[in-house]
């Protein structure tokens, strides 16, 4: 067939152009590798372009050389950023020499003088650097008074600005430590009108606290006064040293209590919110605030303090009082929160002068004895020996053995335990004026019931904060549960038996030993632990029965001749006939003449002066001879203790 007459047929295949376009769209957008000759140099978006020579030079450098090069670049950047960079480097080199311990005083003095000469006119700028501020601190520590005056002159105009700086604050504290009375007064005057803002600042508060700590009573009052009222902040000299509290100041100046309350609230609230509560001036401010605060404001502040914040305050006099007030006026839930926050911190608190009083307050108030036993008592049991021998550590133990004793607690300590918030205390008295019995047999007030019903409907979480001071349990029952039922008393007696001689001769341990030996106040240990107490009497008598140490043994002293132990044993003879009988039979019978002089004579005279007839008759035969001879002297007016 011929193909001439045939028409050309259309191709049924897809066009190559369509398929090629789709194929190109699926291709990777990453450019293919090309030879070095075909590559074009693209300018970098940032910084100066590197030349080919620089690249070759950097690739040819060793690792050590690259580090040196990077260090040089860093140094160059620091020089541009810091105007006194070279000076700082010079000061650091001098500092490395002057801070050595083996350097002579004259050499150090020369280095310090040179450093101060280099810094002259630039002290405020240098003080804000983390490196050079250390140089300043060392200079202030070892320089002469004339050099301190030079530094202080430069510091004074920039005092407030530097007070809020992270690094300069340490230099300022050193300057305040070495400041004269006039210089300290000038610094405190510079703080006038700025105390409240600085107390809200993390670093500024350190300067205010340091100045408050170093200042006199009048200067402390000056710093505190402007926190009470706007008038006291603006005008100087409105108060004197006679007005020691905010209540006295309000009475003298005729200020409005509500205005003072609002002013103090505005200052205190941000301080508590930021958690800057470590300073004594803040603790004093809070204590003063609670004396004038209304019921709602006082309850709010105490509620904010519950928990970990309170642990940071118990190391000061006013801080520990705030903790006691929080425990007294807090609800059961808040007390539980406070005690749980003390976990693993009880030992440290017990050895602290003021923290130990917080533990004593808990033992006197909190009714949840299971929680107190679990967290506080168990931690105290682990260090009983150290607690007994420590001046502060014995206080919680003595509070359980003999509560609120003026023999062991000072007047200030007893006043702290009796402290309360006036606005919350007045409400407590009105609530307890009419009491009824609830289903558990506990006494509660009718007004308390009404208020509880109202608070549930309106604002229960807030009003729950305000409760009656102290617990509902009988104090004797609470002591029984904490001391005897918990096993603390038994463990304490065992420790006393093991360390009888050491405790008796200790200035502080002998008092705990005495209270344990007599069975505590109200004889709380006697019914259930009488056998254990007899073991203690035997242990003391065994130590007393030991022979006198030889004259060559000057370091050792017999417990009958020791000042502290002889007084303690004498008191036990007068007050515990059972102990007196064991001691006389085991240690003194037939040996009274050899012990009739020195401190031991007071113990022998106690056998004659005791009110117990059996003890007197037991020792009469042997002691009466000594009395008649004049060897043993008995005071005619002396009465049994």
From Swiss-Prot:
The keyword Transport does not apply. InterPro entries: ARM-like, ARM-type_fold, CPL_dom, PUM-HD, PUM3, Pumilio_RNA-bd_rpt. Residues 1-82, 427-468 are annotated as: Disordered. Residues 441-455 have a biased composition (Acidic residues). Keywords: Nucleus, Repeat, RNA-binding, Translation regulation. Its main location: nucleus. It comes from the Eukaryota. It holds the Pfam family PUF_NOP9. Pumilio repeats lie at residues 118-153, 154-189, 190-225, 303-340, 341-378. One of its GO terms (cellular component) is nucleolus. The keyword Repeat applies. One of its GO terms (biological process) is embryo development ending in seed dormancy. Residues 14-27, 67-76, 428-440, 456-468 have a biased composition (Basic and acidic residues). GO terms for molecular function: RNA binding. The pumilio repeats mediate the association with RNA by packing together to form a right-handed superhelix that approximates a half donut. The number as well as the specific sequence of the repeats determine the specificity for target mRNAs. Sequence-specific RNA-binding protein that regulates translation and mRNA stability by binding the 3'-UTR of target mRNAs. This is Pumilio homolog 24. It comes from Arabidopsis thaliana. The gene is APUM24.
């Amino acid at each position: 067939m011929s193909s001439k007459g045939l028409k050309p047929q259309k191709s049924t295949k897809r066009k190559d152009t369509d398929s090629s376009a789709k194929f190109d769209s699926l291709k990777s957008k990453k450019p293919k590798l090309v030879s070095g000759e075909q590559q074009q140099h693209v300018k970098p978006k940032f910084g100066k372009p590197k030349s080919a020579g620089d690249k070759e030079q950097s690739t040819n450098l060793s690792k050590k050389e690259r580090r040196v090069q990077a260090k040089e670049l860093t140094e160059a950047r620091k020089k541009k950023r810091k105007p006194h960079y070279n000076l700082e480097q010079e000061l650091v080199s001098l500092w490395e020499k002057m801070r050595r311990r083996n350097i002579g005083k004259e050499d150090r003095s020369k280095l310090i003088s040179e450093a101060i000469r280099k810094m002259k006119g630039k002290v405020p700028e240098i003080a804000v650097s983390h490196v050079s501020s250390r140089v300043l601190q060392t200079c202030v520590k070892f320089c002469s008074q004339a050099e301190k005056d030079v530094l202080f002159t430069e510091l004074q105009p920039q005092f407030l600005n530097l007070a809020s700086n992270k690094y300069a604050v340490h230099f300022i504290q050193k300057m305040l430590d070495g400041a004269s009375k006039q210089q300290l007064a000038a610094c405190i005057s510079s703080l006038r009108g700025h105390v409240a803002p600085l107390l809200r600042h993390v670093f500024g508060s350190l300067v205010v606290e340091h100045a408050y700590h170093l200042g006199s009573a009048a200067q402390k009052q000056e710093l505190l006064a402007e926190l009470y009222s706007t008038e006291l902040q603006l005008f100087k000299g409105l108060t004197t040293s006679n007005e020691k509290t905010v209540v006295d100041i309000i009475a003298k100046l005729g200020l409005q209590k509500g205005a003072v309350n609002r002013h103090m609230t505005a200052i205190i609230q941000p301080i508590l919110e930021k958690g800057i509560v470590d300073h004594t001036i803040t603790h004093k401010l809070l204590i003063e605030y609670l004396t004038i605060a209304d019921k709602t404001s006082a309850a709010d502040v105490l509620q904010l303090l519950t928990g970990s914040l309170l642990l940071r305050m118990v190391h000061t006099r006013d801080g520990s009082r705030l903790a006691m007030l929080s425990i007294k006026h807090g609800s059961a839930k808040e007390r539980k929160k406070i005690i749980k926050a003390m976990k693993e911190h009880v030992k440290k608190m017990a050895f602290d002068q003021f923290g130990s009083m917080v533990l004593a307050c808990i033992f006197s108030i909190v009714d949840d004895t299971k929680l107190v036993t679990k967290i506080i008592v168990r931690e105290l049991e682990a260090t009983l020996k150290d607690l007994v021998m420590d001046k502060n550590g014995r206080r919680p133990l003595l509070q359980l053995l003999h509560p609120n004793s003026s023999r062991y607690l000072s007047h200030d300590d007893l006043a702290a335990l009796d402290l309360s918030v006036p606005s919350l205390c007045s409400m407590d008295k009105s609530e307890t004026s009419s009491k009824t019995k609830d289903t558990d047999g506990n006494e509660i007030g009718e007004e308390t019931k009404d208020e509880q019903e109202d608070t549930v409907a309106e604002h229960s979480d807030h009003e729950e904060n305000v409760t009656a001071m102290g617990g509902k349990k009988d104090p004797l029952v609470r002591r029984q549960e904490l001391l005897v039922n918990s096993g603390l008393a038994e463990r304490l007696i065992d420790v006393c038996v093991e360390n009888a001689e050491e405790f008796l001769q200790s200035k502080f341990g002998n008092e705990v030993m005495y209270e344990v030996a007599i069975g505590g106040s109200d004889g709380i240990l006697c019914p259930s632990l009488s056998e254990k107490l007899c073991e203690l009497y035997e242990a003391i008598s065994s130590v007393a029965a030991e022979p006198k140490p030889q004259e060559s043994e000057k370091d050792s002293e017999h417990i009958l001749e020791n000042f502290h132990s002889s007084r303690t044993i004498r008191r036990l003879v007068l007050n515990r006939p059972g102990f007196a009988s064991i001691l006389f039979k085991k240690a003194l019978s037939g040996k009274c003449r050899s012990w009739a002089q020195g401190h031991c004579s007071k113990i022998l005279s106690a056998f004659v002066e005791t009110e117990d007839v059996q003890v007197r008759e037991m020792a009469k035969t042997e002691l009466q001879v000594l009395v008649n001879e004049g060897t043993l002297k008995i005071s005619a007016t002396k009465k049994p203790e």
